[in-house]
């Protein structure tokens, strides 16, 4: 019997990480957690180490590492604790590792994910910011290393399942007319426009269908998440922004569709549970049980669709503009959004000001080419500085 595949889970204490470990635990003969990383919920990381017995755990700083190492030793575990970005890159690229779940939220996940790519690992990509920030460089690294890149976002995983196997030859060459990227519309789809100025972080995080972390929940409410997914889809499937159409589908049962030139439209359906795309990517090209209940079409009963209102969701408009501009624009969009959303969650800015901050940053800074990773992080830093200046200027 062959050994279980060794899986590094970057962002193990987040919702994607926990769902990944749930799927892994259902198939101990196939998968073993090799390394787990956590950022803030370190008591939870300790509990995960006790349950899954990884070779390594990674935490952000040395003090936390000492505390976790002491706790693990006291529990009789041999798990070794590593520190910071260097530790993340080490467990992402380790020779023993077969696949890496890249689920660290935001720009912080880029370097470890690239380390896994350059080491030729199978990449389960949940960190959409990695592609948004450095799309051309990232895909170039994938091609150079021969790494297998499998999307975890439910929408991109759905598109992947609906695409022909040889879609890398170009969408027009395989008969694809367009990608239909579905969105729930979030908690504010029908909120009166006058009330949006006063919505709270808790309201923004109350997603009607999905259980997610707070940052991505706010992105879903503003539809910036869908904008980032539009950019990600362009890189994953070599599509032009004009070939990706966003469709609001409140039930979140159809996770995305692919429209073919012969009039066929293929869709992937399922209950809104991230274990489905995770299991699909872990086992690809095979299929395994994810623990997700079968879809009951009779209970769903109806499927609704509508066009997104860009006045209600200006972040979607800004993301499409950044996708069309290319180069540094998506990286700056992402960085400005991260600063603005953090300020909103801290109660320093209002919900509608998130888009205002992003738009100002994009208008202030010219678009430049990103020829290397240093240029990517320079664009990221510039956008964060400009967003911070907006906060300071407005007394936030």
Swiss-Prot record:
Enzyme Commission number, as recorded: 1.1.1.267
Manganese in keyword set: yes
Any one GO molecular-function label of the UniProt entry: NADPH binding
Catalytic reaction annotation: 2-C-methyl-D-erythritol 4-phosphate + NADP(+) = 1-deoxy-D-xylulose 5-phosphate + NADPH + H(+)
Signal peptide (residue range): none
Keywords associated with the record: Isoprene biosynthesis, Manganese, Metal-binding, NADP, Oxidoreductase
Pathway this chain belongs to: Isoprenoid biosynthesis; isopentenyl diphosphate biosynthesis via DXP pathway; isopentenyl diphosphate from 1-deoxy-D-xylulose 5-phosphate: step 1/6
Pfam family for this entry, one: DXP_redisom_C
Record: residues binding 1-deoxy-D-xylulose 5-phosphate: 128, 154-155, 184, 207, 220, 225-226, 229
InterPro entries assigned: DXP_reductoisomerase, DXP_reductoisomerase_C, DXP_reductoisomerase_N, DXPR_C, DXPR_C_sf, NAD(P)-bd_dom_sf
Binding positions (NADPH): 13-16, 127, 129, 213
Domain of life of the organism encoding this protein: Bacteria
GO biological process: isopentenyl diphosphate biosynthetic process, methylerythritol 4-phosphate pathway involved in terpenoid biosynthetic process
Cofactor: Mg(2+); Mn(2+)
Residues that coordinate or bind Mn(2+): 153, 155, 229
Role noted for this protein: Catalyzes the NADPH-dependent rearrangement and reduction of 1-deoxy-D-xylulose-5-phosphate (DXP) to 2-C-methyl-D-erythritol 4-phosphate (MEP).
Recorded family membership: Belongs to the DXR family.
Cross-referenced PANTHER family: 1-DEOXY-D-XYLULOSE 5-PHOSPHATE REDUCTOISOMERASE, 1-DEOXY-D-XYLULOSE 5-PHOSPHATE REDUCTOISOMERASE, CHLOROPLASTIC
Designated name of the protein: 1-deoxy-D-xylulose 5-phosphate reductoisomerase
Organism: Pseudomonas fluorescens (strain Pf0-1)
Source taxonomy: Bacteria, Pseudomonadati, Pseudomonadota, Gammaproteobacteria, Pseudomonadales
Gene behind this protein: dxr
């Amino acid at each position: 019997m062959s050994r279980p595949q060794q899986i590094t889970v970057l962002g193990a204490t987040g919702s994607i990480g926990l769902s990944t470990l749930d799927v892994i635990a259902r198939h101990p003969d196939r998968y073993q957690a090799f390394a787990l990383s956590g950022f803030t919920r370190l008591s939870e990381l300790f509990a995960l180490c006790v349950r899954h017995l990884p070779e390594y755990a990674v935490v952000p700083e040395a003090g936390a590492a000492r505390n976790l190492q002491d706790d693990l030793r006291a529990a009789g575990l041999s798990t070794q604790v590593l520190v910071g970005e260097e530790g993340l890159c080490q467990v992402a690229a380790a020779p023993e590792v077969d696949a890496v779940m890249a689920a660290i939220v935001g720009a912080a996940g880029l370097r470890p994910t690239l380390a896994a790519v350059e080491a030729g690992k199978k990449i389960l990509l949940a960190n959409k910011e990695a592609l948004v920030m450095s799309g051309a460089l990232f895909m170039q690294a994938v091609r150079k290393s021969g790494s297998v890149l499998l999307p975890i976002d439910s929408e991109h995983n759905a598109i992947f399942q609906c695409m022909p196997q040889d879609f890398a030859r170009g969408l027009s060459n395989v008969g694809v007319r367009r990608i239909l990227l579905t969105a729930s519309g979030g908690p504010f789809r029908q909120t009166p426009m006058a009330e949006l100025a006063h919505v709270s972080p808790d309201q923004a995080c109350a997603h009607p269908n999905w259980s997610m972390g707070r940052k991505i929940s706010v992105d879903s409410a503003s539809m910036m998440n869908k904008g980032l997914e539009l950019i990600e889809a362009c890189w994953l499937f070599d599509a032009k922004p004009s070939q990706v159409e966003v469709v609001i589908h409140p039930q979140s049962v159809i996770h995305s569709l692919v429209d073919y030139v012969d009039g066929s439209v293929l869709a992937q359906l399922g209950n809104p549970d991230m274990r489905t795309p995770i299991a699909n990517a872990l086992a690809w090209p095979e299929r395994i049980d994810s623990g997700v209940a079968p879809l009951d079409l009779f209970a769903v009963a109806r499927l609704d669709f509508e066009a997104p209102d860009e006045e209600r969701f200006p972040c979607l408009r800004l993301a499409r503009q950044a996708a069309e501009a290319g180069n540094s624009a998506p990286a700056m969009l992402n960085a400005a959004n991260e600063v603005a959303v953090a300020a909103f969650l801290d109660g320093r800015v209002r919900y509608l000001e998130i888009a205002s901050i992003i738009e100002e940053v994009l208008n202030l800074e010219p678009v430049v080419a990103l020829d290397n990773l240093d240029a990517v992080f320079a664009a990221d830093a510039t956008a964060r500085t400009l967003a911070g200046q907006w906060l300071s200027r407005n007394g936030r």
